[in-house]
């Protein structure tokens, strides 16, 4: 156990440093922005330093572990730790949150509260990914919801209150099932509650109870991931939220659902996961086709990108349900890859809206000529979204396919059928992506508007876009960097399915 509390500092720094924002002058927007960005950069540097010098890549066990007794009466511990499964999402969270803070530069209304909520959300997300205690995981899961609700309801579009209410109803409803699952797992088989992940991983449950616990956790993660039919909050939320909030939602929030599915359902409840995996694979396949088809019919640009996110998360579900090293590594890579690509697409959609004040695709057109930089960036990330070879999405989807084909859990014909149907979904992806590009950038609608003049991408937008584009290309060319983080932990998780 590392004596220095790296993880505690990393988890609490954003929210505690963010609290001091309220002592800043009310009109000091510039100071508040720079302060928030500096906190995010400091947090990212601390995280990177701790992982580079104190994390062993070839060790599947929990590292940087901290365990402090918090509330004696409940035997509740502040228990944190990092392993190969959580290191990728934690680094992704730091990277995307820093860039989302920079993307929020134009926000001037209630600037202190806005930036505090961004930092509070940062703490909740890091805490969720590094928790080693079920109750602490639940608290961090809930802590992250409140800032999203306020960011959406106060800085959203015309229907922001409707979208915020829908978001909180869905997620709070899912959290009830999460709390039931945590309580059931903690109270079973012991006079005292046992909430430690390590203890729960070695606990055997009756099959019926394990299935009930699995289903409870699954509902909570299905809302976040999201899994159809519990996905309808996502397009509305993305359609109304400020694009910096959308970056956090698409880049990190959806990944929390996938992370929970692996961390708790797959690692702690392996028998139930083995029973549910065929159904999960069917749901993932349907989700890819359904969301891709629905995306094509969306007039709203941000809703089209939101449905594309639902479709891409279907590949993560397929990888998790394959119960193979290859498939699960592919699912983790898809989580990281989509975190970058989804955040970038929402950022570019938001910067385009700032200039032309249009969000409906059939009203756009012809802005490639006055805005060539935005056109180039949007085209590049659309290519990444449709899994162009050489970019991260291609490698992730290809590895997931190999995971399905090599899975010993399924017979040959179902594997061929699932691969064939999923391939149709991959064909639909370029259709809605290229159609979106054509409607926004080609034609003459905006170019022929009298006295129209649009500013192209500035240095801030270019910097944010290039910072996201470099990892997309880097992972596409050398995916082994991401695999090296998770491969040993994935083997340890899957050993439960063969030796337990």
From Swiss-Prot:
Catalyzed reactions per annotation: a plastoquinone + NADH + (n+1) H(+)(in) = a plastoquinol + NAD(+) + n H(+)(out); a plastoquinone + NADPH + (n+1) H(+)(in) = a plastoquinol + NADP(+) + n H(+)(out)
Q: Which Enzyme Commission number(s) are listed?
A: 7.1.1.-
What are its GO cellular component terms?
A: chloroplast thylakoid membrane
User: Which Gene Ontology molecular-function terms are recorded?
Assistant: NADH dehydrogenase (ubiquinone) activity; ubiquinone binding
Tell me which UniProt keywords the record has, alphabetically. Chloroplast, Membrane, NAD, NADP, Plastid, Plastoquinone, Quinone, Thylakoid, Translocase, Transmembrane, Transmembrane helix
Locations listed in the record: Plastid, Chloroplast thylakoid membrane
TM annotation in the entry? 4-24, 35-55, 87-107, 113-130, 134-154, 167-187, 208-228, 242-262, 272-292, 305-325, 330-350, 386-406, 416-436, 463-483
A biological process term (GO) from this entry = ATP synthesis coupled electron transport
Q: Which domain of life is it from?
A: Eukaryota
Q: What is its main location?
A: plastid
Q: List the disulfide bonds.
A: none
Entries under NCBIfam families matching the protein = NDH_I_M
Protein name per the record: NAD(P)H-quinone oxidoreductase chain 4, chloroplastic
Organism of origin: Nandina domestica
Q: Which gene encodes it?
A: ndhD
């Amino acid at each position: 156990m590392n004596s220095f509390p790296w993880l505690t500092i990393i988890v609490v720094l954003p929210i505690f440093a963010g609290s001091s924002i309220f002592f800043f002058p009310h009109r000091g927007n510039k100071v508040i922005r720079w302060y928030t960005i500096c906190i995010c950069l400091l947090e990212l540097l601390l995280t990177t330093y701790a992982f580079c010098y104190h994390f062993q890549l070839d060790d599947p066990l929990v590292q940087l572990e901290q365990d402090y007794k918090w509330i004696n009466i409940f035997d509740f511990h502040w228990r944190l730790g990092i392993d190969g499964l959580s290191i990728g999402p934690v680094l992704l969270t730091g990277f995307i949150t820093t860039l989302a803070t920079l993307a929020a530069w134009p926000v001037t209304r209630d600037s202190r509260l806005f930036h505090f909520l961004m930092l509070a959300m940062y703490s909740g997300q890091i805490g969720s990914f590094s928790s080693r205690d079920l109750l602490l995981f639940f608290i961090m899961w809930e802590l992250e919801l409140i800032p999203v609700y306020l960011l959406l309801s106060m800085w959203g579009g015309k229907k922001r209150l409707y979208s915020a209410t829908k978001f909180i109803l869905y997620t709070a409803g899912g959290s009830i099932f999460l709390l039931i699952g945590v309580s059931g797992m903690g109270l079973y088989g012991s006079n005292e509650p046992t909430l430690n992940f390590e203890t729960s991983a070695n606990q055997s449950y009756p099959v019926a109870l394990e299935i009930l616990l699995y289903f409870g956790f699954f509902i909570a993660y299905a809302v976040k991931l999201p899994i159809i039919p519990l996905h309808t909050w996502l397009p509305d939320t993305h359609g109304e939220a400020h694009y910096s909030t959308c970056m956090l939602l698409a880049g990190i929030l959806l990944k929390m659902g996938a992370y929970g599915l692996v961390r708790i359902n797959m690692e702690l409840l392996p028998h139930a996961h083995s029973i549910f995996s065929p159904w999960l694979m069917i749901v993932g396949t349907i989700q890819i086709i359904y969301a891709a088809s629905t995306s094509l019919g969306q007039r709203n640009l941000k809703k089209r990108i939101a449905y594309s996110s639902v479709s891409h998360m279907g590949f993560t579900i397929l990888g998790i349900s394959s119960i193979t090293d290859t498939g699960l590594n592919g699912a983790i890579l898809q989580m990281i890859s989509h975190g970058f690509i989804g955040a970038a697409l929402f950022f570019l959609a938001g910067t385009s809206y700032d200039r032309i004040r249009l969000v409906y695709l059939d009203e756009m057109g012809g802005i490639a000529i006055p805005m060539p930089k935005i056109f180039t960036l949007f085209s590049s990330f659309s290519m990444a979204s449709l899994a162009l070879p050489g970019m991260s999405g291609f490698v992730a989807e290809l590895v997931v396919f190999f995971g399905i084909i090599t899975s010993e859990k399924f017979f040959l014909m179902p594997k061929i059928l699932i691969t064939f149907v999923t391939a149709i979904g991959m064909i639909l992806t370029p259709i809605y992506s290229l159609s979106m590009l054509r409607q926004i950038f080609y034609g003459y609608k905006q170019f022929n508007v009298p006295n129209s003049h649009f500013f192209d991408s500035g240095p801030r937008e270019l910097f944010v876009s290039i910072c996201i584009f470099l990892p997309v290309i880097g992972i596409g060319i050398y995916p082994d960097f991401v695999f090296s983080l998770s491969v040993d932990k994935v083997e340890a998780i899957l050993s439960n399915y063969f030796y337990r």
